[in-house]
């Protein structure tokens, strides 16, 4: 019996050492590819043309639960709906101005477009947050502010691209806010293992070895390496203006998409959900969204002909489609 226990102890210790060795090895001895300024993977020409004629409000601050200031842009209207619309990876709220101006100008909704922590011109720690889940907390704090300011309005939370994923994560988990009525997902990122993922988009350089290693360490409560970069973004040089965010830490990247059981996060979204995807999206597999959302009876999927990844945010037709859904 003693011999058996001794052998079991040795095997257990050896397995633990091997597990830690693999976790630390994958985390520390792999690197994230440097972002390229030459790639043109997701039709940035639309973004260039859009920003030439933008009317963009100044950033305003709000205080989050950790006492720090985060920022948003505010588009006022007389509507009884408020949309909180969150930007995608790599940039910030500025590129959402055309959609926000349309919704507010047409009297469809008042719009708030936050710069997520780690993003935008005012961030103190670009590409990083303090811990996994802090993005959800910040969004909840903004939602509470909006509810206080607009107590009789419907609240819709929306996100484009990676922040569509962040919205799913928040809505499908324990941090969902009870005041939210509906969700708007514009070409949302789901998960690297979801059928919507496209391997050849050339937009992101994800270090899967590091992601796996850090995931292994996090599963046993080791989080002190979560500040390490896990992904970078190939944003063309001519659209960079020193307010972009070209790399994410592991803890920020994890916070920007649904959990590994992404089907469960989607299923648990118990409000009305509208998913808009362009048939010509260069980043995701547009024809797979129906399958990914099939277990949520509240979800409506709309595929726009001739629309690209940015097109679902920037095209006037997309603005009208979104407005029509909001007015239902």
Model-derived features: where do they sit?
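An N-terminal hydrophobic leader/cap segment in hydrolases
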Residues: 4-63, 69-73
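The serine-hydrolase catalytic nucleophile loop
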Residues: 89-101, 287
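Catalytic nucleophile-loop/oxyanion-hole region of alpha/beta-hydrolase
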Residues: 90-93, 120-154
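Conserved alpha/beta-hydrolase
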Residues: 100-124
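Active-site nucleophile loop of the alpha/beta-hydrolase fold
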Residues: 184-194
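Short beta-strand/loop motif that positions the catalytic acidic residue
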Residues: 269, 275-277
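Conserved alpha/beta-hydrolase "acid-adjacent" motif
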Residues: 282-288
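Catalytic histidine-centered segment of alpha/beta-hydrolase-like enzymes
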Residues: 307-317
């Amino acid at each position: 019996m003693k011999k058996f226990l001794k052998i079991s102890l040795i095997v257990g210790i050896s397995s633990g050492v091997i597990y830690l060795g693999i976790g630390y090895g994958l985390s520390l001895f792999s690197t994230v590819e440097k972002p390229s300024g030459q790639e043109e993977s997701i039709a940035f020409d639309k973004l260039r043309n859009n920003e030439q004629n933008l009317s963009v409000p100044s950033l305003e601050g709000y205080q989050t639960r950790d006492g720090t200031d985060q920022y948003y842009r505010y588009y006022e209207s007389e509507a009884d709906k408020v949309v909180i619309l969150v930007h995608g990876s790599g940039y910030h709220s500025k590129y959402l101005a055309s959609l926000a101006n349309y919704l507010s100008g047409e009297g469809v909704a008042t719009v708030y477009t936050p710069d997520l922590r780690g993003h935008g011109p005012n961030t103190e720690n670009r590409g990083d947050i303090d811990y996994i889940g802090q993005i959800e907390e910040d969004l909840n704090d903004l939602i509470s502010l909006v509810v206080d300011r607009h107590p009789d309005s419907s609240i819709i939370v929306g996100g484009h691209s990676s922040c569509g994923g962040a919205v799913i994560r928040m809505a499908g988990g324990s941090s969902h806010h009870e005041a939210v009525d509906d969700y708007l997902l514009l070409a949302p990122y789901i998960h690297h293992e979801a059928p919507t993922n496209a391997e050849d988009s050339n937009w992101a350089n994800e270090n899967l070895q590091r992601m796996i290693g850090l995931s292994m360490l996090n599963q046993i409560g080791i989080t002190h390496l979560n500040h390490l970069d896990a992904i970078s973004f190939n944003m063309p040089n001519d659209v960079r203006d020193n307010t972009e965010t070209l790399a994410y830490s592991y803890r920020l990247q994890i916070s920007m998409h649904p959990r590994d059981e992404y089907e469960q996060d989607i299923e648990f979204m118990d409000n009305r959900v509208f998913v808009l995807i362009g048939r010509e999206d260069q980043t995701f597999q547009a024809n797979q969204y129906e399958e990914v959302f099939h277990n949520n009876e509240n979800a409506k999927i709309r595929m726009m002909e001739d629309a690209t990844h940015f097109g679902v945010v920037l095209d006037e037709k997309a603005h009208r489609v979104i407005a029509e859904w909001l007015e239902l």
